[in-house]
Amino acid sequence: LMIRRPPRSTPLYSSAASDVYKRQSYYSFFGAKKSKKLRFNILPIILIVIPSFLILNQPDLGTAVLIFIMGFSAVFFSGLYLKWVVFGSSIVFISIPVVIANLKPYQMKRLEVFFDPDKDPFGSGYHIIQSKIAIGSGGLTGKGFMSGTQSQLNFLPEKHNDFMLAVLLEETGLIGGFFIFSIFFYLILISMHTSIVARSRFSSIACASIAVLLFLYIFINCAMITGLIPIVGVPIPMLSYGGSAVISLCAAMGFVLNARRQRDIKLEGIINA
């Protein structure tokens, strides 16, 4: 993991160890035995908490939150007693003030602007203001492909990355947004259904964790570009520019499709028998 320095990149795409790890973290429960007791789940929890803390110190709050929530969802799906899940959640909520108190100056600025973007309209609040204008101006049918004023005239920063969805909503409008979210919903639904019908416990938990990961990506990015939460740098799946993020997400969906295929092969064998 890269600590306290930006991730290395190439001219073709950016690559960050944390991007790869947040997809790998749903395998952390692999070392846990099939037990609801806490002592059998200590190793997976350690494999989630330590990297989350290190990534938080990069600082990369968005990625740390993704790894932490998605990793613990995997432990939860593995059958840990609910009381331990509630206990762990309570510790997280109690530690929120500590995390806020140790935020970097630019992160605190984002938090302040979140409550009042007009407080710094040409600084920290500029991104969210332009994003809202882009989304609102798209209307029902949008302005047309490559015809968005906020994106094409470069009013909207990071339009190829975290705010890619705002660009698409400006160009395609509410109708295009409905189509995009329908595809995302279908991917989540397929992942959850595969989790239910998977042949192995490992595949079941992994597919459920992938569904949680997709939901977190979509929810956080949508809330971010609409001003419901502060900007934390979480891209929209499959649409935002990126190297390792796109590859690892595709690998995750490939895992889901393979688990589903194995289940179909088993059913075909039963029918032919």
Positions of the model-derived regions?
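Juxtamembrane/interfacial segments around transmembrane helices
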Residues: 91-103, 115-119, 135-147, 229-233, ...
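Single conserved hydrophobic/aromatic residue that forms the stacking wall/gate
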Residues: 1-17, 21
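TM-adjacent membrane-interface loops and short helices in multi-pass inner/ER membrane proteins
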Residues: 113, 117-161, 172-176
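Residues at secondary-structure transition points
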Residues: 7-8, 12, 155, 159, ...
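Glycine/serine-rich anion-binding loops at beta->alpha junctions
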Residues: 15-18, 57-59, 139-143, 234-248
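Hydrophobic alpha-helical transmembrane segments of multi-pass inner membrane proteins, especially
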Residues: 15-127, 166-226, 251-255, 271-273
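A juxtamembrane structural motif centered on a specific transmembrane helix
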Residues: 221-273
